[in-house]
Amino acid sequence: RLASTFFAGNPLKGKAPLLVSALMYTNPMMIYFGQELGEKGMDAEGFSGEDGRTTIFDYWTVDTIRRWRNNGKFDQKLLTEDELSLQDYYAKVLNICNSSEAVREGEFYDLMYVNPQLQKQYTFVRHSEKETLLVIANFASQDTEITINVPEHLFEYYGIKENTACEWTDLLSGSQITTAFSSNMSPKLN
C-alpha cells in the first residue's frame, strides 16, 4: 500500500505517480482497493498482522472502503476532507484518461531527454489531431517553478507552429491561461 508507513507513508505522494502512469500511454489503469481514499492498510488483521498490506484471505473490511460505502449509501458522509480531496484528484485524473482524445488515442512524446535539469519533475506530451497535452508531474513535496525545454523536433513532427499563442487549461484545476507554446516554457507547479 502506497500510504502505508512501510512504504511512502503519505497517500499524497501517489499523486504524481498516478498522473504519469495514467496519462503516459493508452493502457488501462488499475487503482488498488482504497488507494483513491488513501488507505494505509495498517490494520492488524488476520494471519499477517500489521504489515502495511490488506489481507486477501481473511474476512476483513477495509476502514476507508467501509466508511465510503456507509451501509450501501455511498454518500461520502463518513469520509474525511483529506480522503474526499484525494478521491476527487483520482477521479479527475481518471476522467482525463477517458475524455482526452490525446490520452485515449494519441501519441506519447518524452521531454526528459531535453530536460536533464529536472530532478523531481517528469514531463511529456500527448498529442492527437485535435489536442495536445503537456503533462508535468511534480514529485517534489513543495510547489516549484521550472523551465521546460521543448525540442524543435516536436513542433516539426506534429506540425505545430512554434510561438503560436495557445489557450492552456490546467485539467486538474480548470484554470486557463493564454501563452505561446514555445521551446522554452516556465510553468509554476503545485
Task: Cite the ranges covered by each PLM segment.
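Secreted, luminal/periplasmic, and some membrane-associated catalytic domains
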Residues: 1
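Loop/helix patches that line or flank the sugar-binding groove of alpha-linked glycan CAZymes
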Residues: 4-166
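Structural signature of nuclease core domains in nucleic-acid processing machines
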Residues: 134, 177-178
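Flexible, glycine-rich phosphate/dinucleotide-binding loops
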Residues: 143, 175-177
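GAF sensory/regulatory domain recognition
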Residues: 167-175
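C-terminal beta-strand-rich structural cap/linker in extracellular carbohydrate-active enzymes
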Residues: 178-190
